[in-house]
From Swiss-Prot:
Component of the Pelota-HBS1L complex, a complex that recognizes stalled ribosomes and triggers the No-Go Decay (NGD) pathway. In the Pelota-HBS1L complex, PELO recognizes ribosomes stalled at the 3' end of an mRNA and engages stalled ribosomes by destabilizing mRNA in the mRNA channel. Following mRNA extraction from stalled ribosomes by the SKI complex, the Pelota-HBS1L complex promotes recruitment of ABCE1, which drives the disassembly of stalled ribosomes, followed by degradation of damaged mRNAs as part of the NGD pathway. One of its GO terms (molecular function) is metal ion binding. One of its GO terms (biological process) is RNA surveillance. One of its GO terms (cellular component) is cytoplasm. This is Protein pelota homolog. There is a cross-link at residue 162 (Glycyl lysine isopeptide (Lys-Gly) (interchain with G-Cter in SUMO2)). The keyword Metal-binding applies.
Amino acid sequence: MKLVRKDIEKDNAGQVTLVPEEPEDMWHTYNLVQVGDSLRASTIRKVQTESSTGSVGSNRVRTTLTLCVEAIDFDSQACQLRVKGTNIQENEYVKMGAYHTIELEPNRQFTLAKKQWDSVVLERIEQACDPAWSADVAAVVMQEGLAHVCLVTPSMTLTRAKVEVNIPRKRKGNCSQHDRALERFYEQVVQAIQRHINFEVVKCILVASPGFVREQFCDYMFQQAVKTDNKVLLENRSKFLQVHASSGHKYSLKEVLCDPTVASRLSDTKAAGEVKALDDFYKMLQHEPDRAFYGLKQVERANEALAIDTLLISDELFRHQDVATRSRYVRLVDSVKENAGTVRIFSSLHVSGEQLGQLTGVAAILRFPVPELSDQEDDSSSEED
């Protein structure tokens, strides 16, 4: 993401002009735009024209509109963002108050104005415009007949390809059908890797599977690379890291990122940091339950006691339609930072973010036990009974 201009007043009202450069920038933009904001961008509008003879025709024109945002729609697989709202500035093609949907496009700038820019949104702009935040990890999670090729960016896990091939069982005295199907499966996975992984950007490609599938696949891939003189694969061989996974399903990616070998290799990535923080929370919940809580009320009480060491919070909560609720989460983040706590904002498009979402989207690891919080938890559960 490129920051073109930033005009924010002391009262935190103002506007920023940005240019999305990568597909992931659309995800960042989705987290920036909120209902009630005003968005100015170039768009296509179908307009009706009347000729001198009175015949009516229609054609599409490119124009710049400023909308008051009413609805936001994000397609995570295509990384497309559509913003619907009413026109609030005079335009020769569109009446004031008329509805329009802008589809934000890569490499076309837009200007976003807000009455209140909060700290979480401003921090996201800083991160989005930091060139170090790029998709530098890829993963192939596989089992016999099933593979997912994923890109792990700082903000999301993108499934770029799913490969499924029916592998017949080995039969006594006749393994040829099984072997042919397995070779066809491996070949399709190799093609998906070459199609979807940019070796100039990606620093590490994780190949994860149960059993010996990963070893057999990598042997096949590099034998074929030698045969066909595939320089790209051969030159990047050192980037491939083989690790264990319980299955070829996407959810196995979390356990892969928890693997100590992987964690040390990816120690500088945000995704690995999120996975470790969630893992630490679960361990604390198991061994010292007085120092691990989830749910907004419990976490707010822990914060009042200045007890929060690490706050885990889903970015989904900052997209809440209710301004008061959204502000409550922002205040919690600001307060934890002011009290020297660490804040981890999880992407809801990461596997770890999905898991945090199942724990209400907000959790905390405490510096010291707060037994009264456990008592309150017991009281509330007995009241429910």
